[in-house]
Amino acid sequence: MEEGIVHKLDVFLIDENVSIKHVNLFDGDSYGCNIHLKTATCKYITFILVLEPDWENIVEAKPIHMRLNGKKIRVPLVAKTHTSLIYKVVIYVEEDALARFYSDVERSYTDVYPTFLVNTDTRRYYILDSGRTYTYIDPFISDGDKRRWLTREIEEAYDASTEEEEEDDTEEDMDTVHLYCLEEEDEEKIADTGNDNQKDAED
């Protein structure tokens, strides 16, 4: 991995009012994460991803891609500032799902991305694997982040991007994505995490 390059990436789940902070790697020109979504009801989930590239060490930032249960989903870039690139994507889930965000597909990167569990029913959130990051979860979105990233301009830019851009044949429109259950090994990992948390509570 490229040493000396340090990006910053935060992920906000707007409808859940959750902040997943510093999901970027310790170093290296790559960023992404895996988010297991647990839900018993159909719902829309809105993600805003704020990337602060290390402009001192790179010329161009890699775009962020997404897969939802293996299906490619377009992630519109809705705003740029001198320091940040802001992406927004809205998905519709009917049951448990796995969302993967990534700038690279090489396993040398993706294997060290962090992994999270977001239970939208119980409103509980866990870090399943921090990977090579200093990531943490805030069970709220701070007022400062709301003022910076949850603006009308970003909302309007997202609406415009969904209306104007032609559908990419290589990526799935969110309304046509059929969701499936988590892979068995992921379910076991999540179950183990839940049992550990229950034991901690009993202790």
UniProtKB/Swiss-Prot annotation:
Region (Disordered): 182-203
Any Gene Ontology biological process: viral process
Domain of life: Viruses
Family listed: Belongs to the poxviridae C7 protein family.
Protein role: Plays a role for multiplication of the virus in different cell types.
Name used for this protein in its record: Probable host range protein 2-3
